[in-house]
Amino acid sequence: MLRTLVVAVFLGTGLALSGVQPAAAGAPAAQVAVNPGTGPAGSAVTVSGTGFKASTTGTVIVGSATFQFRTTATGAFSAGITIPAGAAGSTTITAKTSSIKASTVFVVQAAPVPAPQPPAVSTDPLRFGVGTAGGAMAAAELDEVANLAGESPSLVLIYKDFRQAPPLAELDAVHARGAEPLVTWEPWAWGGGVNQPAYSLDRIAAGDFDARITEWGQALAAWGKPVMMRFAHEMNGNWYPWSEGVNGNQSGDYIPAWQHVHDLVAAAGAGNVQWVWSPNVPYWGSTDLAGLYPGAGYVDVVALDGYNWGTSQTWSSWIMPQDLFGPGIAQLRTLAPGKPILIAETASTELGGSKAAWNTELVSYLAAQPDVVGFVWFHLQKEADWRINSSDSSASALRNALLARRS
């Protein structure tokens, strides 16, 4: 009994001398947590803890940065801190009050690398445009084209048939990119083939679609920004139901149908619409352009669609841009003197020659024509691989040619 008493007194004397005030037997150890536990440097986080000295001031330490906090009567605290900008990897966060401390880890994530912005739209007089599989809403496709070409397209093709509502969301998407929409408005039902009597030219001129045409005119007028309207294109061929000689259409039917549609849209107040008359490049057997031209008062821009099919088809052979477009451009100049000329669709296959050389000549030839205002590349893998990047050499050649015409 005496020995036990002496030991107890000795221990009590030792505690007093040391000045240490340990937690009561069985008290939980200090703990600290951080929320969230991961994020980039510079993140605002909350550090909280329990089991610390009560009602006192403490410090949170993160690297060389310190943050003050005060504990509650129960030894708890919560403090907002910022992870230092230079922190990396697993960063230790320590909280302490006098002799009590505890630590946790914050995992610093690498800041995401921002996606590179696509190149800007060129202000060169020869505009570069594109049509892609996904159309105006396919931002990734348009960004890809911009990066391939070294500049963002200033014209973006949109295709709509007579059953569809005005594509206002698509127009907005194109405008947001700093480009102008080129709407190809096709008076038929997609997928229905050439023989569609309900969409014959005389039915259009007779007013069967006036409600839809007026709806478009009003919507485009309300939209208010510039839009190019390529109505009933490639009419000198025989593969669409609005061509003369097919679908019950007679010679002379095309012009009244065009003029009727034009007048309804204009009457709706859509003065922001530029009308683009866009035949196919003339070929043996195609309908003569003179009988299809609606007149200077009904057309703002004349255009051509033309492709180098190379040897991809049994009926085709390699043709360079000057030979492909030269005769048609000459006809347009005679038929519509003073009108700007647009190549509204073009591309080349790889089969039968050098696509790289073709791309280079296309840009240099068109840039040398003072009345040609632009061209639109058909960036699709369809009947042939028309894509700009069907090969590395093709993509490089077009990019370099566009750069040269800007120099």
Where are these regions (language model features)?
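Substrate-binding cleft of secreted/luminal carbohydrate-active enzymes
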Residues: 122-135, 339-407
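Acidic (Asp/Glu)-rich catalytic clusters
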Residues: 142-151, 165-183, 215-224, 292-297, ...
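Aromatic-lined carbohydrate-recognition surfaces of secreted/lumenal glycan-active proteins
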Residues: 258, 262-288, 338-351, 374-380
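Substrate-binding cleft of extracellular glycoside hydrolase catalytic domains
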Residues: 169-273, 277
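Glycoside hydrolase catalytic-domain groove-lining segments
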Residues: 169-186, 304-351
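Extracytoplasmic/secretory-pathway segments with low complexity and glycosylation-like composition
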Residues: 1-113
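Boundary/entry segment of secreted carbohydrate-active catalytic domains
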Residues: 111-164
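Aromatic- and acid-rich polysaccharide-binding/catalytic face
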Residues: 156-159, 289-320, 378-380
